[in-house]
Amino acid sequence: SQIIVADRSSIGADTGEAFEVNGVGAAAMRGGADRVLPLEQDERVVVDVPDPQVLLRPVALPRTMLEADKLIYVPKMKVHKLTNITLAMKMNQGSLDWYDAIRNHGPDMHAKMVDMLKVLRPDLSIVDGLWPMQGQGPGSPYPEDLIKDFNVILAGKDPVAVDTVGATIMGFDAKHEVPMLRGAEVAGLGVANLDQIDVVGTPIDQVKRHFRRGNINLVGVDPKVRVYMGRTCDGCLHFTRTGLDVYLANPHLWEDVERVTFIMGRDVEVPDELDHDPPRSYVFVVGDCAAQFQDRGVFLPGCASTSMHFTLFPGKTSEEVVERYHNLQPPKVNIEGYVFPETTS
């Protein structure tokens, strides 16, 4: 048997490089692992989700995970702007290729995680709450969002119970604020009732703390930001706010930009005159729902659009922003019999 430490990084990041830069790869080998595995390099197996709520077509999952004798998840305790928490259940998002990861990356994310637990279920979940993240997680650029005095480790065999206890420790009402937990319980995948969970060790009340919630709203975030927003789902809002937070937390990175305008969502009304004059000012048309306005600025297509996430637009021309955006989109993996979602080119 082998001990394999596997992971998949976020958009625009190479997991193999991340293993080297953050030291996890070297630490894993020192600790007795046989190898580390960037999941984007693993062979994919097409799997049907039983009784799906949102993943109605097959998903392609890493063969190594599907065939493992034991799966141990080691999530970092973090607030997530879309799902409130990202603990054991949310780890399954990292098993997906980027097409499936971005798909259903909005209001249906909770149901998606319930579906994923039906095909990938950890035998043990160990939550690292030593230095957890609050606020604009899962990758907040704000230093104050990193909590450096928490020092909690949480572990259990039932990922739903682990997440329920974890959410409670973070100050959430698990059943009412984290729909994936009650969804998993209703589906018979675990226990989300705190009264039915045997918590061993330090009592919850001794470590419980209110973690600041994340926020994906774009209204009033900065005087230079203007938003024309119709019916916009959480996916495009999440990716837009994620990228924008980098500049809100580090104003010097866009000090030469005078105006940033976003057009997004269905049925949005837009003025006849917009100020798109890079690198002084930019208009971003975000997501497929706003495609009718794509000639008004830089069009960032997709559902959800990955929008400002790693776009790094200040100082770039429209053409340079578009090129970087498309280069960040994942290449299709050639899997026989696997039909990928259509993407806007």
Give a label for each model feature.
Residues 1-345:
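N-terminal and secondary-structure boundary signal
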